[in-house]
């Protein structure tokens, strides 16, 4: 699933705004804008409109997130969102009908309306016929092909932080089910609680599986003291399988974190002497709580995306490389330094190459690799493509002028600094000034103010 286009009418600041995405050419969409231009509002409503897909995937009668009444533009009685997504070829196409105006059967569209009645109460209406047909295609394909995964839909608002690391809960119902990868509810902020619960669960499961392999090899040995033979058998056992197989979820998590944070060498759950989350970061082994708030938040965000992809692609050896879907991150440059800000989008694309990544931000460092992005400028309730070629030409022209001016400027050797006057000379000058009478002192002050230092020297 890829987002093809979305249109807003009379929603908050957006009276008539449409975005046409180009995932095939530019898989990353960057929406830049100053503060209070509506970036968060835009991304929030994109997510709200897309939640109807996982909601109907869960149950044909389940609604997605409904537009709040207060988001209807002032002095307007109705607002509308129209969404269009691209259906992957492996899922087929929508059936053609004589009444439909859509010619491309690989696209699925649905509309969401909110109308205020005479009492000022909003009434929601939806047109989801094509969405329901698409969900039927997904159910048919996934039943026939268990290896086929489901698309990701993840949204991370600007208010995101690690509040509590809950590692004590075990055996939570439904935590490893695919449907738990979707959040079909309004999300004003996120604390990544589900990621830490999932991390404890898969660590227990995959550590137990690894221990079972070792125990099976030990049981085959007649002499339990032959440690070298046990180690050799263990190496042979693991050599016959892909390296992801013993712990596919943990492998996906660690390898993805390594791509986005090269300075993070390891990330694991320590059971003894006490249960805690550990990180090997910049050559030091630290408790997770000892990392900076920004580092903790980004590790949790990336880990949560990995969690969702692992749940939606349970039989994939590389869920992060094979998983598809839409990833939405608001204010991606928040709390990042300049170095990470310029590289974060490129690294996210390397870690999740088949995800459609849509982000908002305000800093120019995000444009470091903008040649491969789809960039928009949001201002005054309208969105327009960012002309990167013109900006690049202007920068190159300025750079050329600076180089030419530097070549024409004659080289001037810096003058040597005057040696610091000796202390005895200063004391002698001070003593001479003290020996002057009041009239001479006043004359000296007048000449100093007038800048006539030559006369001052001769009089002394």
Q: How would you name each of these model-derived features?
A:
Residues 35-36, 74, 145, 242, ...:
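Aromatic-acidic/polar surface patches that form glycan- and anion
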Residues 1-214, 371, 375, 380, ...:
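P-loop NTPase switch/coupling surface
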Residues 1-61, 266, 271-406:
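Switch/communication elements of ASCE P-loop NTPase nucleotide-binding domains
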Residues 68-72, 222-224, 228, 350-351, ...:
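An exposure/low-complexity boundary signal
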Residues 149, 246-254, 395, 405:
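A structural signal for well-ordered alpha-helical scaffolds and beta->alpha junctions
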Residues 24, 184-322, 413, 426-427, ...:
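Extended helical coiled-coil dimerization/tether regions that scaffold
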